[in-house]
Amino acid sequence: MENLILRPERPSEYREMEELIRDSFWDKYCPGCSEHLVVHKMRSSGVIVPELCLAAEENGELAGGIWYAKAAIRNGETEYEVLTMGPVCVRSDRQSRGIGAALIRKTLSLAAGRYPAVIIYGNPAYYGRFGFRPASDFGITDADGNLCPAILIAPMTDEIPGGAFDEGTVYHVTPDEVRRFDKTFPPRRKHYHSGQLFFAPPTPPPEEPLLYASWDLHRRAAKVLRDSRVLEAWESIGGKVCGVGSFRSNLMMKHRDIDLHIYTKNLDVPRTLEALSPVIASAKTIGLCYINGAGTDEHCLEWHLRMLDEDENEWTLDMIQILAGSRYDGMMEDVAEAVMDAAGPETRKRILALKNECPDDLKICGIEFCKAVIADGVTSWRQFLTWREENPPETPMNWKPDTEG
């Protein structure tokens, strides 16, 4: 570190800092990120602790930052005010140089004696070096009363009250909020990789049965994707994995299909087959179908994997390996993003209702439901059947919602 200065964040650099946060967290814990929006909301909240929100400046340039908010330990009707820390970010090209550690140590020293504790969700192996201990040692649980190894505490006084940790609502952002905020930044592709904690921002289960069924199927799909280890297989040959279709747009309903596009620098069939061999050899794998489209204008290889989940339900992973930089690079990812932008809560429910009413033996591509509802206002199964007679299946395949109007 050269000429490192830790100082309060300045309003004039808020946007630059949000860009830095977005860059440093992108694809780290889930496809894309939400930390830049969390900080944006935190600044206008009543819980931010501005004197502990520091910027790291190195050689006159922003290199990172740290943010604190007020939180609480709740014990019955009693509430004890504590601090929570995060996010902590360091510019991508300045990481692993001690800047993040310097921010943490500096702010913890500033907070000492002012609050009883700093409580966070984090990795014990990393944060232990700064004096954080398992919150369970102090009788502190999550908001639901469960002991959680990821809840850590840096005690600032000798007496720490037990109870349930409540980080407040400032850290809770919805996928819709994140997408809207992201529209104010340069577009950037979201990827899946094996090191991510989540394949979608974690949200509580919906109460409405239709929405719960979709939420639960997506949750199960994410577990299948993780348990199958296909991400590790693609990463072993440098593949960049993107979600498309209903899995990416959170519109899964009944069919256990996961659509993925994988971008590689070349289409080497033997190399890909070797990379996928551990997946193929799994006792959970039923079969693999391969289609060679490398010589077509689509420049792709299709790998259709059938496998069982832990409950012996059959899933299909439709993995399309596409030549990076070719004509179709990013096309369906853009469609999925546009569908999510266009599908508000009521529109989403109409799409899911049509999918739910669709007979199991009738194979209809998900994009048809989306086009029928979003573009043409279809609201019932009868209307959808009429609409489908007037719109041959190949027409929706070339459709993308207009989100600019």
How would you label these PLM feature ranges?
Residues 85, 90, 96-109:
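Conserved acetyl-CoA-binding loop-helix of GNAT-fold acetyltransferases
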